Regions:
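Structured catalytic core of nucleotide-sugar glycosyltransferases
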Residues: 1-80
Length: 80
């Protein structure tokens, strides 16, 4: 069984990397991390584009659609 961790984010340039690291420190090994950037305008997108981590999948919304939409996008892509 795989655990899917969905992280919706909007303008989280100051916190997104520490959030990812916190999830990766969990004892659960069979997991996937899905980040849905909901149209960030503060550099979050640039940070995520530079992230080279096979455990993290990133999905971008072209514009802000709200937290619920970001979660639904993540759920639709989740394997767990």
């Amino acid at each position: 069984m795989i655990l899917s961790v969905i992280i919706p984010c909007y303008n989280e340039s100051k916190t997104i990397l520490s959030l990812i690291e916190a999830v990766k420190k969990s004892p659960v090994k069979n997991r996937e991390i899905i980040i849905v950037d909901d149209g960030s305008k503060d550099g979050t997108r640039d940070i995520l584009n530079q992230l080279n981590d096979p455990e993290v999948r990133i999905i971008f919304h072209s514009k802000n659609k709200g937290k619920g939409a970001a979660l639904r996008t993540g759920f639709s892509e989740a394997k767990g």
